[in-house]
Regions:
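A juxtamembrane structural motif centered on a specific transmembrane helix
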Residues: 230-263
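Hydrophobic alpha-helical transmembrane segments of multi-pass inner membrane proteins, especially
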Residues: 1-136, 175-233, 260
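Residue-level recognition of oxygen-bearing side chains
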Residues: 32, 152, 255
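Active-site phosphate/pyrophosphate-handling residues
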Residues: 36, 172, 254
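Transmembrane helix boundary and interhelical junction motifs in multipass membrane proteins
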Residues: 73-78, 154-157, 168-170, 187, ...
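TM-adjacent membrane-interface loops and short helices in multi-pass inner/ER membrane proteins
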Residues: 129-170, 174, 183-185
């Protein structure tokens, strides 16, 4: 319902409907619903995993993803999709679901490319940001400049110019960190994030209760995949998705959701 409300009444940011305001306070429902989404999937998959159960879980996951796609929030749609596919594989141990998910993701990527103009712009900027560095390639070019300028040890606090990157507090915070604190600091940050993910996986592995096991795995997948999308986009490893870096990027909805996940 909340995702549908954003689709109808949400404000458009960078071509996507991500949030709506209540009494002047902006909310991004897709962030909060991640937790409920994982809990529901864990509950369904912890019961008897019949074909009907799997079908119903697939319908629910598809409904969430389709609403997000309609809102043009493709980064969140990708997180929801990947989380479902991996959780389904963990619950059933059937490789078919992974292969099917990969095929579906490839088809969805091609379809999104032709349906959404901002996706085509991001793909073009990712392929070669230098061809239009003053316009479509400006963000990713400035991001790479910032990382390169910071080098291994960084330029120092307030010594860089991260403000030259549009939306640096939300989408490009990793580049700003590397510019001022250095690539080594960025590597340490990634190592901390990975260690947190591995701890979540360990907790899930030792859980004997299926519901808690799948819920832990699901929240861990959401966390690490969001980090992958953000840092991958900042470093030009993958196209930009507009996803925030958990606990680091500016954004109350993202920070609060991540805190609730760890709680």
């Amino acid at each position: 319902v909340l995702l549908g409300a954003v689709l109808v009444t949400g404000s458009i940011i960078n071509g996507s409907k991500l949030s709506f305001s209540i009494l002047g306070i902006s909310f991004q429902p897709s962030e909060f619903i991640k937790i409920l989404y994982v809990i529901f999937l864990a509950g369904v998959l912890s019961e008897a995993r019949s074909r009907m159960t799997i079908f119903l879980s697939a319908v629910l996951a598809a409904a969430h993803v389709l609403v997000l796609v309609a809102s043009k929030d493709l980064g969140s749609a990708l997180i929801y999709s990947i989380t479902y596919v991996i959780l389904l594989y963990i619950a059933t141990r059937k490789l078919f679901f992974i292969l099917g998910g990969m095929a579906g993701a490839a088809a969805a990527s091609v379809l999104s490319y032709y349906l959404f103009s901002h996706v085509r712009v991001r793909i073009a900027a990712w392929q070669n940001p230098w061809t239009d560095i003053s316009a479509t390639g400006y963000q990713i070019a400035q991001s790479l400049f910032a990382i390169g300028t910071g080098s291994w040890l960084g330029m120092g606090i307030d010594a860089g110019s991260p403000r030259s990157i549009p939306y640096v507090e939300q989408d490009f915070i990793f580049s700003a960190i590397c510019e001022e604190y250095g690539i080594l600091y960025g590597i340490c940050l990634v190592a901390i994030c990975v260690s947190l993910f591995l701890e979540i996986v360990h907790i899930a592995h030792v859980c004997e209760e299926p519901f808690l096991k799948y819920a832990s795995y699901g929240l861990g997948i959401v966390y690490i995949f969001q980090i992958f999308l953000t840092i991958g986009g900042n470093t030009k490893f993958i196209p930009l998705t507009g996803v925030t870096l958990p606990l680091i990027s500016y954004g109350g909805s993202s920070v609060l959701t991540t805190m609730l996940m760890f709680a």
